[in-house]
Curated annotation (Swiss-Prot):
GO MF annotations in UniProt: 3-phosphoshikimate 1-carboxyvinyltransferase activity
Broad class of the protein's primary localization: cytoplasm
Binding-site residues for phosphoenolpyruvate, renumbered to this chain: 22, 93, 121, 170, 351, 394, 419
Keyword Amino-acid biosynthesis attributed: yes
EC number, as in UniProt: 2.5.1.19
Record-given protein name: 3-phosphoshikimate 1-carboxyvinyltransferase
Function: Catalyzes the transfer of the enolpyruvyl moiety of phosphoenolpyruvate (PEP) to the 5-hydroxyl of shikimate-3-phosphate (S3P) to produce enolpyruvyl shikimate-3-phosphate and inorganic phosphate.
Lineage: Bacteria, Pseudomonadati, Pseudomonadota, Betaproteobacteria, Burkholderiales
Keywords (A to Z) from UniProt: Amino-acid biosynthesis, Aromatic amino acid biosynthesis, Cytoplasm, Transferase
Assigned protein family: Belongs to the EPSP synthase family.
Reactions that this protein is recorded to catalyse: 3-phosphoshikimate + phosphoenolpyruvate = 5-O-(1-carboxyvinyl)-3-phosphoshikimate + phosphate
Subcellular locations according to the entry: Cytoplasm
Active site, UniProt feature: 320 (proton acceptor)
Length: 434
């Protein structure tokens, strides 16, 4: 197995320019593909997840012209030209879920599949929602999970669509992005949410990006969404992908643990991503944080004893960045509790179980529940722990922070960061100092 040894490091400082946001990149690629006109996308993330989306769009007949982190997408005016395709989408939820919805109304015969873990990640609630409007979708293996076979259906909307919101916000994102292309009797389609909607900031990203392409979604709280029906997305001409706020969390934490000053560029007050809220969580833990419209800077911890304050917080709104808090909790002066993180169970791996296992390797006492994690830091971190990453990019990036505790750490399968941030470890090493 490949591995990477890091540290021991005693400080971290400098400036890092963030790669484009994964969540925004794949949404914008699909919206541009469905729109009328050409869209020039800049600062597009180059990663495993965006590559599978680009490959799929190409197979569906979308004209793409790439040059570095810029991509010109020629829109299809709402209908993919390829009526048959076999689409491998890796472990990219941001590709599988929205593409499934778009393909379901396209009148073709498609197969959607991915890596084995993707075939363990639920999609049944989205399929149920699409079947309510006449989509023909079959499960090839296990009910409720990919791989999927999508066939031509008789698509019509004559009642509100109901979808669960408590498993993944990507189901709602997929419906919202596709439904404007479907005609409805009164010119609008209503989507109603069963249960509590998780990861609300990701829905906000979806709605804001749809607005950039000329379609406005109305919402009544977070339980009812009204989408204009039978309309066409219009290209905004140019759109820039802002930096990835989830990726920012590792560097911001490094600035707290390693003294800083450490500045990330590409996200800030003006960001549409909820994960900029990670900076607020760090402040609650005692970090010195300042922020501009497109930058955030951390300058160590505001305590003489040099430890973070423990935190007890609901992380429903920022589940991905919450993983970084779990590792930062190793550097706190007491026990931290991360609540409302049930969505971790159905991510790239079961992140609650994986995080608990690996935190224990570095000496923490960890209690895990169905939707929470309690982390009590050790007096001293265990050196030379070999961290398993479970083919999960965020596990690898989070545990790099252990090296800032003055102990070496080994990261197994470090290349898994290719999912969202192929150059992460080079960037981290440029900022961390012995």
């Amino acid at each position: 197995m490949d591995y990477l040894d890091l540290g021991p490091y005693s400080s971290a400082s400098g400036t890092v320019r963030l790669p484009g946001s994964k969540s925004i990149s794949n949404r914008v690629l699909l919206l541009a593909a469905l729109a009328e006109g050409d869209t020039t996308i800049t600062n597009l993330l180059d990663s495993d997840d965006t590559r599978v989306m680009l490959d799929a769009l190409g197979k569906l007949g979308v004209k793409l012209a790439r040059d570095g982190d810029t991509c010109v997408v020629t829109g299809t005016r709402g209908a993919f030209t390829a009526k048959t395709a076999d689409l491998f989408l890796g472990n990219a939820g941001t590709a599988v879920r929205p593409l499934t919805a778009a393909l379901a109304i396209n009148g073709g015969d498609y197969r959607v599949h991915g890596v084995p873990r993707m075939h363990e990640r639920p999609i049944g609630d989205l399929v149920d929602g699409l079947r309510q409007i006449g989509a023909q979708i079959d499960y090839e293996q296990n009910e409720g999970f990919p791989p999927l076979r999508i066939k031509p259906g008789t698509i019509s909307v004559d009642a509100p669509i109901r979808v669960r919101g408590d498993v993944s916000s990507q189901f709602l994102t997929a419906l919202l992005m596709t439904l404007p292309l479907v005609k409805a009797k009164d010119g609008r389609t209503v989507v109603e949410i069963d249960g509590e909607l998780i990861s609300k900031p990701y829905i906000d990203i979806t709605i804001r990006l749809m607005e950039r392409f000329g379609v406005t979604v109305e919402r009544d709280g977070w339980q009812r969404f009204v989408v204009p029906a039978g309309v066409r997305y219009r290209s905004p001409g140019r759109i820039m992908v802002e930096g990835d706020a989830s990726s920012a969390s590792y560097f911001l934490a490094a600035g707290a643990l390693g003294g800083g000053p450490l500045r990330v560029e590409g996200v800030g007050r003006a960001s549409i991503q909820g994960d900029v809220g990670f900076a607020n969580a760090l402040m609650q833990m005692g970090a010195n944080v300042s922020m501009g419209d497109d930058w955030i800077e951390v300058r160590g911890i505001g305590h003489d004893h040099g430890k973070l304050d423990p935190i007890d917080m609901d992380f429903n709104l920022i589940p991905d960045a919450a993983m970084t808090i779990a590792v930062a909790a190793l550097f706190a002066s007491g026990t931290s509790t991360l609540r409302n993180i049930a969505s971790w169970r159905v991510k790239e791996t079961d992140r609650i179980a994986a995080m608990a296992t690996e935190l224990r390797k570095v000496g923490a006492i960890v209690e895990e529940g169905a939707d929470y994690l309690v982390v009590t830091p050790p007096q001293r971190l265990t050196p030379n722990a070999a961290i398993d990453t479970y083919d999960d990019h965020r596990m690898a990036m989070c545990f790099s922070l252990v090296s800032l505790g003055g102990v070496p750490v080994r990261i197994n399968d470090p290349k898994c960061v290719g999912k969202t941030f192929p150059d992460y470890f080079n960037r981290f090493a440029a900022l961390a100092k012995a």
